[in-house]
Regions:
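Structural detector for short beta-strands of small beta-barrel domains
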Residues: 1-12
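Short aromatic-glycine-enriched beta-strand elements
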Residues: 15-19
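Short, structured beta-strand/loop micro-motifs enriched in basic residues and often containing a Trp
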Residues: 21-29
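Short, Lys/Arg- and Gly-enriched loop/turn segments at beta-strand edges
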Residues: 49-54
Length: 54
């Protein structure tokens, strides 16, 4: 079981969201993997290989 990791979406460029975790790690994720309704400023959690909006 993976620990949850919390992210804030910083920008969206085409098919990719650029986000930063609460610990400062930057990440790039394909939009099709993220929940519908994800926008700039969204708070997300990744847990057990799933993304969820907070």
């Amino acid at each position: 079981m993976m620990e949850p990791v919390y992210y804030t979406v910083d920008s969206i460029d085409g098919d990719y969201a650029y986000m930063t975790s609460d610990s400062g790690v930057e990440n790039q994720v394909a939009m099709f993997l993220l929940p519908e309704g994800t926008t700039v400023g969204s708070r997300l959690v990744r847990e057990n290989f799933e993304w969820n909006l907070l």
